[in-house]
């Protein structure tokens, strides 16, 4: 097995702007996960947590909360193949999101996967950069993505 590609400098990372760097494996959200997330977050509307009632909805079943979808993406992408990015940062933080859209509902039991595209890298201060990512979640067989989220990671070099 070949060693994974490594990106170790900001210059190497900037060359990859506009490129998709990771695609996760397919994953299915279970009703149990949706129910637990609903209890933790308070997002427990019937469309998420009542399979019998949701069967008669336009979706034909319960749908995952958008915020649950957003929450599982980091783990999906961390497990995905792709270049290892090690800029030698002392630490990095989730700086936030510029835009999050939930476009197509994910019906419980549908397969979904995540894609990660590098949008930009900006120097913020000496030794501090922002990395701008697009996280896209697609549902198998759907014409439109389930979610598109533009996130920012702050790295302290």
Residue ranges and their predicted role:
Residues 2-17, 102-157:
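HotDog/MaoC-like acyl-thioester-processing domains
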